[in-house]
Amino acid sequence: QTRYNTLHFLFRLPPMMKKPAFRSLLVGLLLIALAGSFWYSPAWLQLCYGLALFLFGMQCIEEGLHNAAGGTLERLMASSTATPARGLMFGMGATFVLQSSTLVSLLTIAFLSTGLIGLAGGIAVILGTNLGATGGIWLLALAGQSVSLSPAAVPMLVFGILAGFLKGRFAAFGRVLVGIALIFIGIDAIKDGFQSVGGNLDFASIRSGGAMEVAIFSGIGLLLTVVLQSTHATLILTLAALAGGQISVTQGFAIALGSNVGSSISTAFVGFLGSERSGQRLALAHLLFNVVTAVLCLLLWLPLTWLVAQAAGWLGFNSLLQLALFHTLFNLVGLAVFWKLQARLAESLQRWLPDKAADEVLIPEEIPEKTMRRKQARYLSDNMLRAGDTALRAVFQEVRHLGALSLEVICHVLFIPAEMLYQEEEPLLEPPEPPLQLDAQALYENYIKAPYSELLEFTSKMDIDDEAQQQQLLQAHIAAMQLVEIVKDSKHLQKNMQHYLQKPDSRAYPHYLRLRAHLFKTMCLFRRAAAAPAGSEAWKEGSEALDRHVATLESSFRSRVFDKLRQDELGSWHTSSLMNDTNYAKRIGSGFQEILRVAGAVG
């Protein structure tokens, strides 16, 4: 699921290609071509088989750790980014375990976008992911081409599958064991594939010139990493090709350099397409780190490769260990450059990518129906689904966004400028000036139903096992559903509001003005209470003020209408309309009260 979501971000199809028939045809042709290539080259089939096992093993490890840890990963990351050194260590450890710097970077972007960690802490984690990627490469290089990992993988696979029949964390740890076993088997299959290719694939004989050769193989490393979504997978292929003699050491260095840039490009795509400003800043930081480091290493290419060759001669390193050493030096160069600049980099990123001006008014006062566009959810993206805490926080943020939209839709229904909601002092409402024209149904469908549908789709994809988090998600659903019902109730008010507020000579006119003012004050009180932290004194005072105001509808407004009816100042037709609309107003007030109670239960 995670890998599919990432590739979906990277390779968005043009509109014509989004048609199901065309997409099915394209996928079918690709599968036929791939099957034909397998028949033509058994060695290529062996390589793809090993790569598929490796990537699926990574996915198994990710899923297993997520299910075993619950919210531990989220809490660990939040506590591990308190200092730059701890953030660096967390990035190194997480990358070594998950075997994917891209995955850890995307997780970090998700945490940052929901406010679980700060930008400075996220930058430290990103620096750690690059160093963490070197750990697995050193182990594989030390194991060498002659050491087979499959004997260790077989018992792990057996125990992992057996554990999968159990429940809870045992099944999750079994999933991790299966993932590790598949990675081991996949690595052996990749090595066997390159051995089978033998002399049929010999890039080492290519000598196109120093700079051109480095550029070509750096591009190969970049493209491989973007497609495979894993620096580790690219470097394992490189190690296997290097051990089989298909590429030279210098070409391997260039592929390693390109793979680092490729991982940051993948992160940048997802970060910019599926994140708020904070996530975009971190994606840019990752891209800057790897691009600047790559440029420096290219400028220092000759002394850097000479240093690796000299160290290899002193220490007796083979070509595989030389690649691991170069990859480590590459990341150490970047760390040396950026470590002292983290704070300044964070400040620069804030300046380059400032927070988008928070539109006080989400819905313009005048919206031509022909140009009305559906409002999209603001905080929901597939990247937020990578961890339970980030997904839950994104849901809470989106419910708040839906709440703001709901208040503004009701303002439009009542013919009140939405910007009046955000004034510090409660403004004095003026009677609306005719003509009053508005389609409440169109407002509901475009500004409420559309983001609410996205919210429902997002929550259907969430995988949360923790009971406390499940309860919080349920409360968020209740709050969102209440907001939708409140807007639906307000739609019923529009017909009479639009009719009577354009007739100052009507007996019902002053009563609809008072009902309009009552509802506006209800919204203002709710907005102020909801803005305070749940359970705080300000929240309690705001909730009590709302309760008192809602109660006045029954004790004051309704009784006054009946008095006017008895005094023959209102006709029965007007009274019937006012009573019906008073019921809708009461339901709107009760809905706001219920949302505050839900917020208090969640905390």
Task: Please tell me what each predicted stretch does.
Residues P14-L55, A152-F159, V399:
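Transmembrane alpha-helices
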Residues F9-M17, T81-M89, A110-G118, T134-Q145, ...:
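Short juxtamembrane and helix-loop transition motifs at transmembrane-helix boundaries
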Residues I117, A143-G144, L273-R277, T305, ...:
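Cytosolic, long alpha-helical scaffolding segments
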Residues V27-A35, G87-G91, A133-I137, M156-A163, ...:
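Hydrophobic, membrane-inserted alpha-helices
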Residues V27-W44, T134-S148, A163-L166, Q195, ...:
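Transmembrane helix-loop junctions at the membrane interface of multipass transporters and ion channels
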Residues T95-S100, V104-G132, I137-V158, T225-G262, ...:
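Membrane-interfacial helix-loop connectors
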